[in-house]
């Protein structure tokens, strides 16, 4: 090596040592972590959420990052186990997470959010369970609607559009299903609909013959199905097998792409309220849907779209604050309205409340010919 080359290397090394803290920080990526269900009963939801986040990260980085810094995403599998989820959140925090996405299942996020609260790390989740944002954490934020906002819309459709007076409710006995059951039963009562059968099932349940017999024996004019995706498909198939020809109504999980894929023709005719759909008549959602299919060779469901939106919610808050301050970003999100005109990646205008819940448009959907068809776009609950 020549003397001249040694001198150049020494000069470069010295320059790196004396790089200003500001310039050094600017060169570092923003670390975000997906702590999600990639195996176990939550694998469908977690994989979709993760995929949406990764696609958004790719798009954000391609457009220059956030305040000039790129995003770096790390994936962690909770195995749909709340204890593992909590341990992985601690690891992500120790590894320098600026923000954490997930878990998606309500039971896991209820346990793990204590750690993001302790460490003051913004934590985004697609979980719909009403209890998720009722724990008092100022660092928890939804990327989709809570059951408290969704169920009144579903109940109104059942009462006013379907003219149902008596209904059976089929729900999963976990931290997603129980508060969802409470929310829909309360909302149905408000609209004068009587619940004539209130039937609990287990997470991961394979055989739905006995619960469906109870539904049929109750004298219900319709059934409201509130289960996770795989169980929803099994319940729908069993309803058709037993000759049920009355309305099958539900919320977002029942209307998901996974249910259509697993239930096949049995899913046709299923109706209900969906807080998000990849088939929404919204230009930005259609663009992301096409990108998603091109990237992964499968269509997104509601969790895929919500994962994508979540990254842009974080981006909008950081840019509003103007610096990489986790506490300031969390404070900014509370009460913040993010408009598509200002941040197209958020896809729909959205407003956060003081608990981290959001309000925005949602959809009435019917599955026809193996595809979800949007029948009506519903305004934010605050505008009803």
What residue ranges belong to the model's regions?
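Sec/Tat signal peptide C-region and signal peptidase I cleavage site
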Residues: 19-25
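Extracytosolic ligand-binding ectodomains
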Residues: 2-11, 25-384
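Repetitive helical segments and hydrophobic/amphipathic motifs
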Residues: 13-15
